């Protein structure tokens, strides 16, 4: 083992241990059973199908976890973590949403189930021309109180009626009642129950938490600078894509750029995004209008999404093509392993090394993230928010979470690392600005792009999110300079999988925990292929053309790259003596 690899292994063990013990500080999780089995949720919903006056036998259903994020953010910023956790076990902030639909029937049925309390609400879509009764206010209120008491066990007679609305239709009257009460005597937290009566039938009971309008306005004011900085950073990243496109055009005229590998990279992005969208079954189900074919609705959603997917795919195409051209004019080709990876030549030594180093580097990145977040959490007013939020729901709301998380975060790592490191890092080295500039300048943009992602720690102050992500970007920048592009792509992928399997690892289901561990280990698959291939070749007593202990792919050109050009070493490129 080389000295640098031994140091990487040691750093990964230390940083990984620090990362694991600090997960509760980095991403504290709501103390609720958020990963309830879908069949159990369906059974709970079917027990109350009489509430919607509909036999749901033969209906299709999907379930997903939803969160009232404004309510959660307000609770966290106005009381202690322990108080917030206690309130989450009582208030409708995290809810399981179970939706039923039947082809040809326009009336979708939805149930809301609290992870700890059971059924807390329901809805049955009702057309305006459906006939019904016209009740007076007293009869309507009695019907509402009886339905809520029968199915939820909640006595609304002790709640304050804040609003009543009547909507006169041709064939019935619709009435809406809004009740409120304090969550506890003397508490400033108020629960709200909105009940919709269609004729004489209670068609919706929707609980919520009342968030003070003044707090919402204050949050909107705070977001202006945050959103401006993020927009500027995204503009710079998009400009990098334009620069890569222009350099690609120049390189095509000089015969430096092929189209096969860039096309594979772009196609991979489109495939990963499309497959990720397809695997989010509850979202596809939610968008389905049951008056039309379900397959046609899903196909339309996927096709519409593919239009937006073309932009990141085009950027990857340009990043790969421009970076290959830059590599050909440099004495060290940092894209060979990436090219072999995209061509599925995983038996290559370079791919195997990048897989192992990338996985270890992912643990180091987790340690850097943990240490930086701890430092930022000491800033006055700092807050690390409860999870799950944002991308965490991708894994929680899919029947194939391992596959979805692997595909979705692979395309993210591909787009970002090819842009920030493979293209921008190569370009800065080409301009002779030095290694520090190549590692740090793209990392600053990378950190600013993520300043608006509130699920990243710390949530407050917003600018504190830039520091941990920037430091991780600098780490990956130096890893790119020391090793190659594939190493940082796989490291980014591994780090994301560590983070966003967090809630699945805490599941009570052992199979869910096992699949989460398997998902985290997916970036090691290329290394497993390379090692297994070498073991097979040894059993067949064949000579190994690429000794495992050598980094031959870092010392020269990709044999598949044409034409082979004479190169002049730059001031920041290592010499043969320094590599030895």
Give names to the regions the model predicted.
Residues 16, 26-234:
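Soluble extramembrane regions of membrane proteins in the secretory/endomembrane system
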Residues 382-547:
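Transmembrane helix-loop-helix hairpins at the membrane interface
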Residues 218-409, 413-418:
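Core alpha-helical transmembrane segments of integral membrane proteins
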Residues 4-9, 254-269, 330-331, 435-439, ...:
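Membrane-interfacial loop-to-transmembrane alpha-helix junctions, especially the N-terminal start
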Residues 23-31, 371-378, 534-539:
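Hydrophobic alpha-helical transmembrane segments in integral membrane proteins
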Residues 578-580:
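Intracellular C-terminal tails of type I single-pass membrane proteins
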Residues 291-292, 328-354, 427-429, 539-573:
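Membrane-interfacial, low-structure loops and terminal tails that flank and connect transmembrane helices
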Residues 7-21:
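Hydrophobic membrane-insertion alpha-helices, especially the h-region
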């Amino acid at each position: 083992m080389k000295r640098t690899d031994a140091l990487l292994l040691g750093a990964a063990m230390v940083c990984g241990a620090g990362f694991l013990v600090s997960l509760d500080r980095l991403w504290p999780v709501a103390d609720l059973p958020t990963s309830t089995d879908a069949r159990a949720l369906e059974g709970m919903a079917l027990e109350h199908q009489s509430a919607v006056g509909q036999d749901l036998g033969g209906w299709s259903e999907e379930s997903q976890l939803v969160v009232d994020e404004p309510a959660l953010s307000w609770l966290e910023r106005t009381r202690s973590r322990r108080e917030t956790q206690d309130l989450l076990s009582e208030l409708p902030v995290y809810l399981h949403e179970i939706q039923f639909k039947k082809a040809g029937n326009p009336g979708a049925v939805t149930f809301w189930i609290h992870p700890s309390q059971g059924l807390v609400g329901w809805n049955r879509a009702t057309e305006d021309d459906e006939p019904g009764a016209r009740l007076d206010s007293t009869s309507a209120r009695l019907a509402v109180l009886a339905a809520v008491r029968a199915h939820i066990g909640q006595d609304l007679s002790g709640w304050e009626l804040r609003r009543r609305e009547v909507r006169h239709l041709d064939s019935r009257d619709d009435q809406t009642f809004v009740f409120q009460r304090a969550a506890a005597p003397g508490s400033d937290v108020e629960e709200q129950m909105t009940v919709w009566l269609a004729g004489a039938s209670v068609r919706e009971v929707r609980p919520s938490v009342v968030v003070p309008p003044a707090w919402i306005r204050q949050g909107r004011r705070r977001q202006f600078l945050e959103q401006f900085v993020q927009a500027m950073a995204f503009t710079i990243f998009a400009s990098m894509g334009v620069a890569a496109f222009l350099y690609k055009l120049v390189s095509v005229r000089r015969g430096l750029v092929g189209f096969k590998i860039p096309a594979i990279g772009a196609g991979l992005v489109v495939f990963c995004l499309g497959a990720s969208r397809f695997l989010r079954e509850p979202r596809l189900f939610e968008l389905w209008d049951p008056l039309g074919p379900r397959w046609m609705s899903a196909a339309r959603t996927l096709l519409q999404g593919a239009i937006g997917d073309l932009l990141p795919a085009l950027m990857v195409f340009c990043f790969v093509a421009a970076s290959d051209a830059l590599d050909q004019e440099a004495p060290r080709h940092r894209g060979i392993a990436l090219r072999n990876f995209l061509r599925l030549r995983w038996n290559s030594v370079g791919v195997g090394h990048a897989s192992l180093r990338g996985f270890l580097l992912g643990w180091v990145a987790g340690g850097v993230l943990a240490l930086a977040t701890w430092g930022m959490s000491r800033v006055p007013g700092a807050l690390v928010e409860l999870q799950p939020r944002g991308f965490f729901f991708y894994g929680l709301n899919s029947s194939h979470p391992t596959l979805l998380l692997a595909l979705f975060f692979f395309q993210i790592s591909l787009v970002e690392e090819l842009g920030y490191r493979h293209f921008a890092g190569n370009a800065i080295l080409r301009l002779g600005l030095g290694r520090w500039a190549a590692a740090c300048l793209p990392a600053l943009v990378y950190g600013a792009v993520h300043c608006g992602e509130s699920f990243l720690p710390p949530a407050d102050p917003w600018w504190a999110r830039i520091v941990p992500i920037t430091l991780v970007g600098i780490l990956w920048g130096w890893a790119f300079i020391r090793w190659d592009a594939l190493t940082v792509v796989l490291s980014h992928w591994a780090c994301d999988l560590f983070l966003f399997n967090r809630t699945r690892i805490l599941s009570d289901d052992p199979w869910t925990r096992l699949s989460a561990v398997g998902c985290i280990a997916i970036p090691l698959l290329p290394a497993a292929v390379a090692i297994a291939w070498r073991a097979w070749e040894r059993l067949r007593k064949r000579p190994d053309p690429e000794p495992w202990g050598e980094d031959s792919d870092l010392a020269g050109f990709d044999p598949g790259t044409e034409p082979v050009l004479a190169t002049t070493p730059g001031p920041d490129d290592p010499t043969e003596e320094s590599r030895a």
